[in-house]
């Protein structure tokens, strides 16, 4: 059996968003007050060219992003051994009531249409949901793990 060779593929912004759109698992990395990294596993989508994450205002990632909006999202494939990409960007935190329509976009980007949008909106208000919206500014290549090519 041939070894799997690591691959790195440079992508444009459009190709990046096409890669991320069907992938909904990510690790968002923010900066704590003491300067150390804080990582949060999240479900993410792409809406209007930005990576979106539903969250709550009291979560560490939200507190950190408000203080230091430069964040990183490591977007993973469903298959852990599948391709992934690191995206660096600026995060914006949107709280209720302004978060409600962006949360609709978040839901649509992951699951499509909801059977009860009024009920969904009411639940988002009741839960006090926030949206973390990350504008991609820099990204690495789409990568896969494996052996270096010299070992092929």
Where are these predicted regions, by residue range?
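Generic structural signal for secondary-structure transition and capping sites
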Residues: 24-25, 70, 115, 139
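A short, aromatic/hydrophobic, helix- or strand-capping loop or linear motif
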Residues: 30-32, 76-78, 113-121
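Short, surface-exposed beta-strand-loop junctions and turns on beta-sheet-rich folds
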Residues: 59-61, 80, 148-149
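Charged, gly/pro-rich active-site loop segments
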Residues: 1-11, 83-152
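Short, basic/aromatic recognition patches
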Residues: 2-27
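Alpha-helix boundary recognition
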Residues: 20-21, 66-67, 125
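Short, hydrophobic alpha-helical packing/hinge segments within bilobed ligand-binding/sensory domains
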Residues: 16, 61-62
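Short beta-strand segments
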Residues: 23-57, 63-65, 71-75, 84-87
């Amino acid at each position: 059996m041939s070894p799997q060779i690591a691959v790195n593929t440079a992508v444009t912004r459009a190709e990046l968003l096409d890669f991320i759109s069907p992938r909904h698992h990510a690790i968002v990395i923010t900066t704590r007050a003491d300067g150390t990294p804080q990582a949060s596993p999240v479900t993410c989508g792409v809406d209007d060219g930005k990576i979106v994450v539903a969250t709550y205002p009291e979560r560490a990632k939200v507190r950190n992003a408000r203080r230091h909006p430069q964040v990183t999202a490591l977007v993973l494939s469903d298959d852990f051994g599948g391709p992934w990409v690191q995206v660096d960007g600026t995060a914006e935190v949107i709280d209720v009531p302004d978060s409600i329509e962006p949360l609709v976009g978040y839901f649509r980007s992951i699951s499509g249409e909801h059977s009860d949008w009024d009920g969904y909106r009411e639940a988002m208000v009741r839960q006090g949901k926030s949206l973390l919206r990350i504008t991609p500014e820099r990204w690495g290549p789409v990568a896969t793990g494996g052996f270096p090519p010299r070992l092929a």
